[in-house]
Each structure stands twice: as C-alpha cells, then as structure tokens.
C-alpha cells in the first residue's frame, strides 16, 4: 500500500512522447521534472523560481513559448535535482494560486528540446486554439474565436459583439437561401420551354388580329369586323 502513495501518478499520458504506456510510466518513475500548466502569459521566470524553490533546489526552469512569436504561452517545465523535492512540489504547490490563477503541477517524463514550444496551429497551446471564453491572462479569446471576430470586424469596418456576429451570420445564410429559392425556377424561362400563360396570350392575340382584318396566308386582307360607319366593300 505504501508503494501506491510513493509511486508518481501522472494525470495524463502524452501520446506524442513516443513511449508505450509502460515505457511512459517507467520514465515517470525515474523523472524529477514537473510540468506546470494554466499559467498566465505574464508570469515571469523569476516568479516561478521564487515559488517552486520553496520545495527544493531547482536545476532549471524551461518556459513554454509560442512556436511563432517566441513569447510565453502559459506553461513551463521545472526540473528538480531530487525526486523527493519534485514530489513535494506536486503535493504542496499543485492547485495553488499564482498571478490570480490556480496552476496545475503534474509529473513529466523529462524535457527534450522542442517541447518548450506550443503544439497549437497558431503556435500556442492547443487549449488556447478552441477556448471560447475571454481570459485576459492568456491573451483574451481563443485563437479560433479571435480569428472569427477579426473577420467580422474587417467586413463590417469596426468592432462588433459576438452576439452581433452570430446574428449577421444567420442573416447572411438566410439571404443566401432566399436567393437560391428565388432563382430555382429561373432557368426554365431560358431552357426553350414555353410558358403556358404566354401561349394563351399568343393565341388570344392571333384571334384578335384575325378578327380585325389581319392577312391570312394566300388571301387578301379582310375588313375589320367592326365598322365605325357604313361603308361599301371594295
């Protein structure tokens, strides 16, 4: 039972580590590295040293960086010299508050070059790609949400609320549907098919023309059926 409490229990399995789950567990058992998440983008390395050194001597801290901007993006790795100090870090610092944020500390299998960069499409962390809430400590809205808002802002020439964006999107979709419905029967007018109403009008016109003395094929013109005064036929 004592081994259950002394063996590190990571909260996640990093599928991109290249390890099997057994290999990952073995690496965790030997590691004295801590992953720290939910940090503010504005938390400094000096602040991290001040906090995490309370649990033991620190070998180094590796700040997590935006892959493109090379600026802090909300996580770091803390390497201790001893595994006991790393265990104390998880025991006492995990869930504590730093820069008005509850931070998360978890066992890590060990830092490798390249892991300091965010894995998100825009360069930061994946969690900040799809986040829909506004978090001033992590750059405002999530990247995807901010991209959508910027598109609406550019189209409309200024800042608009998210609710207005959704309303405009719905209106645009409705207008597109109405346009498609209005033009659904349009091609028939140009396909060579005659409109029945147009045929009726044409027949009526022909009868009126014949009745008023139009020229029939092979015949001489006829006088109009209705006369305004008595006249002799030629």
Curated annotation (Swiss-Prot):
InterPro entries: NCBP2, NCBP2_RRM, Nucleotide-bd_a/b_plait_sf, RBD_domain_sf, RRM_dom. It is found in: Nucleus. One of its GO terms (cellular component) is nuclear cap binding complex. SMART domains: RRM. MRNA binds at residues 12, 35, 104-108, 115-119, 125-126. Residues 32-110 form the RRM domain. Keywords: mRNA processing, mRNA splicing, Nucleus, RNA-binding, RNA-mediated gene silencing. GO terms for molecular function: RNA cap binding. Residues 182-192, 211-222 have a biased composition (Polar residues). Residues 122-144, 177-234 are annotated as: Disordered. Its main location: nucleus. One of its GO terms (biological process) is mRNA splicing, via spliceosome. CDD domains: RRM_NCBP2. Residues 126-136, 196-210, 225-234 have a biased composition (Basic and acidic residues). Belongs to the RRM NCBP2 family. Component of the cap-binding complex (CBC), which binds co-transcriptionally to the 5' cap of pre-mRNAs and is involved in various processes such as pre-mRNA splicing and RNA-mediated gene silencing (RNAi). The CBC complex is involved in miRNA-mediated RNA interference and is required for primary microRNAs (miRNAs) processing. In the CBC complex, ncbp2 recognizes and binds capped RNAs (m7GpppG-capped RNA) but requires ncbp1 to stabilize the movement of its N-terminal loop and lock the CBC into a high affinity cap-binding state with the cap structure. PANTHER family: 20 KD NUCLEAR CAP BINDING PROTEIN, NUCLEAR CAP-BINDING PROTEIN SUBUNIT 2. Component of the nuclear cap-binding complex (CBC), a heterodimer composed of ncbp1 and ncbp2 that interacts with m7GpppG-capped RNA. This is Nuclear cap-binding protein subunit 2. The lineage of its organism: Eukaryota, Amoebozoa, Evosea, Eumycetozoa, Dictyostelia. The gene is ncbp2.
